[in-house]
């Protein structure tokens, strides 16, 4: 990140230039910055309005669920079946549904490796349960603060890499 300061008309401002700006410090923001770093991109900047605020960190519900390919039990599952289930709800475009399904197990196992304690059975399978409109046992949870635990584990991974963050700023426009 390159940083410059300039003044005009009695006001001063800071200009930050980077290859990749990630906006937000919820699970999506952290999970965007972390793999970019792993792929070799070092010129990353995370910008957030409040690192300790936001939906991922501060909501709780008995229905907080992580949705992934089925990783336990006798029922088979496939990327295509999961994509079709997502698409059939008429809220996810087909190409997005396919990407979400294809990367769901990898993303889930990354969270496990970072320390999110998703439940397992005695054979080591990551157990799941059925939700209202899902034909498989794809849902899993660590309780009412699942997304908080995911956020905190991803945040630790990003901080360990030293990815810079600007906190208490609101992104209005990104100039490219």
Q: What do the predicted segments below correspond to?
A:
Residues 2-13, 49-176:
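Conserved N-terminal/central alpha/beta ligand/cofactor-binding core
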Residues 18-46:
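N-terminal Rossmann-like FAD-binding beta1-loop-alpha1 element of flavoenzymes
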């Amino acid at each position: 990140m390159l940083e410059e300061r300039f003044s005009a008309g009695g006001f001063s401002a800071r200009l930050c230039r980077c290859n990749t700006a990630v906006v937000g410090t919820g699970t999506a923001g952290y999970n965007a910055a972390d793999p970019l770093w792993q792929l070799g991109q070092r010129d990353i900047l995370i910008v957030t309005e409040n690192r300790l605020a936001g939906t991922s960190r501060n909501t709780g519900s008995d229905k907080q669920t992580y949705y992934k390919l089925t990783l336990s039990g006798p029922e088979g599952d496939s990327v295509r079946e999961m994509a079709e289930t997502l698409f059939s709800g008429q809220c996810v475009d087909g190409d997005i549904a396919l990407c979400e399904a294809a990367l769901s197990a990898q993303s889930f196992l990354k969270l496990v490796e970072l320390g999110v304690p998703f439940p397992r059975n005695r054979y080591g399978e990551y157990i799941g349960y059925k939700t209202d409109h899902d034909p498989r046992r794809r849902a899993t949870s660590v309780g009412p603060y699942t997304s908080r635990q995911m956020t905190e584990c991803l945040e630790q991974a990003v901080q360990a890499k030293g990815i810079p963050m600007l906190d208490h700023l609101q992104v209005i426009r990104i100039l490219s």
